[in-house]
A protein has these predicted regions:
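Feature responds to low-complexity, polar/acidic, surface-exposed segments characteristic
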Residues: 4, 8-28, 33-57, 64-82, ...
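Predominantly extracellular/luminal carbohydrate-interaction, adhesion, and secreted-enzyme modules
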Residues: 118, 146
Length: 154
């Protein structure tokens, strides 16, 4: 599905590497492609990326859309479950969820709490079990594509 939708072409011509931890650059590139790969118009606010980086346009798009901010991008940062749903939620326009995230490990005042509640309402995720969401756990490439499929692929 993700290849057919031009969200990713994999890690090589014959592999996707679903069990590899996804980086910030990768998830934002996936989201940029999932949103049609629009040409960014803003100047580069980041000191740690250049036009030669494969994720350059995705990073600028993410900054324009308010998904990320600051002067450093941190492309190789491991992507967590909280980051994943927050990026997806912001890309969707930050819609207000009807309820709250009902997980023992998601405080109501967490920056990502609304994003988690939205992701549950949209059936993107149901948590990791035992009443937890595991916001600090890293996401694999396979998990992120699964989240995207649940959000957009049906």
């Amino acid at each position: 599905w993700a290849v057919e939708q031009n969200i990713t072409s994999g890690t090589s011509k014959t592999t996707f590497s679903p069990n590899v931890t996804c980086t910030k650059a990768q998830i934002l590139t996936f989201l940029w492609h999932a949103n049609g790969s629009p040409e960014p118009t803003a100047a580069n606010p980041f000191t740690d990326i250049t036009p030669a980086d494969y994720f350059y346009k995705a990073a600028l798009w993410a900054a324009e859309k308010g998904l990320v901010s600051g002067s450093t991008f941190g492309a190789n940062t491991d992507c967590t479950r909280a980051m994943t749903v927050e990026y997806m939620w912001k890309a969707a326009g930050s819609p207000a969820p009807a309820g709250k995230a009902d997980f023992d490990d998601v405080p109501a005042n967490a920056d990502y709490a609304q994003a988690v509640a939205w992701a549950v309402e949209k059936n993107i995720t149901s948590g990791t079990g035992d009443g937890n969401f595991s916001p600090a756990a890293t996401c694999t490439r396979g998990q992120i594509v699964t989240f995207l499929y649940r959000a957009m692929g049906k």
